Amino acid sequence: AIDALYAPIHQEGLFGREIFWEQGAACDVVWGRTRGYSDLATFRYTGDESPLRTTYNNFTQVTSRANWVIAKLLEKQAGTALTAVETRSLGEAYFMRAFSHFYIAYRYGTDKQGVPFTRYEDYPDGYDNSIPKQQASVVDNYKYIIEDLDNAIKYLPKFEEYGAEDRGRAHKAAAVAYKAKVYAYWATWDKTQWNNVISMVNELETTYGRDLAPNFDDVFSSDFANFWTKEYLFGIAGTGGDTPGGSEFPGVILENKGWGIYNGWGQNKPSYDIYEEMIKDGAGNDRIKRTLLEYGQEFEFFGETRKFFSTADVESGFMINKYMDAFKYKDADKKGYVSTNGDWPTSRVNMPLIRFAEMLLFRAEAYLATNHPDKAATDLNRLRTRAHLTPIAGNATWTDLYHERRCELAFEFTDHLYDLKRWFHAGNAEIKALAEKELNAHPRARHYADRGDYNSTFEIGAYEDYVNEANPLVKAVKYDDHFIAFPYPSTEITKSGGALKQNDGY
């Protein structure tokens, strides 16, 4: 039952691919291949786009499973002491209920109305299969999530207490990290929550010894020795070979058909916009080289040194490089680094869902929001120093925060789009202007005269797939605040029989 809580987050329907399509509405990533739901990238969505339906259903499924486990274990606990495994399992269930609830809450909830949620343990005679109540505000959802994370901390072990076979399970520090993220998003509606963000990140350092890995590359390494650094908080550990596991995302973003060597899918490519932002730190810096490939950049692929070019699908001129380390080995699939099944192209990488670098970014943001720009600079400079970048001189600004968060976490499942949405809603005027500019921009690409020649000349122009935005005859949608929440799938509205109210503006 516990393993069933984790299984969906590994699959294509969540962090394998589907939840990442949402990022097309920001300017860091373009889809690379034409999809049937381009409205998801142009703020014309209805809630019925298949990625939105799929992720909504999968997260609610995890919540339901966790609810069942919690109710059963609490019922047993009322009559007898739980075993050590049952105690840990109760903590895992609380964590995964909070986890899945959170990803629904912030993406669909606002201060005007929350998202549906119920706790099975609140029914004395057992859950009656009634429709979960829609909370009055997303703040009510956040309160439930924090309570579940506190219970998770009560029952879970520390990460260091796990044996090798159990690493990857929820642990105390992971729950504290998600508390920090919940409080940061809660601060969209209540700025006093920034103080809680600072407290949580401090606790991660002082109580749990979390820190940055020595090198930026270590976070995305194919070496098992680097999977569990102090930076690790929670993620999806993957491997390859004949018994692959983890997220298929590394193969999803690989060049379509992998230059005839491996079955990459060619989806989700970097835009020129994120390259332009990252290159502000200097050409060839450690962070940009690990994060993306540009034309002519050398990289190792199945034991061969190549120079990047791309002839497949819709042109962007770049490819995500963060998760490519496992592909560098000769016979990488046969040696267990990447999956031998190109239809499930996992690889040996511990793909982060939340890591300590993000905690420093949240604390820096909290310091800016509470008028401590000097302390914000200290946290941001820890990231910059690790990547061998020039430190910020003097106090940090909101522009510094925007740049560091965008560049450090590029192409991770940290939800850059929601960063823009929350900054537009509640941000300082400086960062709101940056968010508004990106939300209303059309992503750009490099268009090469000869796509098969890495020395070819190029022009910078609009990405050519999101047809409504590229077509001058169709007026672009101007971002406004109601887009902070997605619309519920129409099937959910219908099934609720009136118990679920659609979000404003849809």
PLM feature spans:
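An aromatic- and glycine-enriched ligand-binding surface/loop that stacks and positions planar moieties
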Residues: A1-Y37, Q113-F117, Y142, L149-I153, ...
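Long, intrinsically disordered, low-complexity segments
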Residues: Y6, F59-V62, G126, Y144, ...
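Flexible, polar/acidic helix-loop-strand segments at domain edges
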Residues: K280-R355
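Short coil/turn linking the two alpha-helices of tandem helical-hairpin repeats
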Residues: A105-K112, E160, Y185-K191, N371
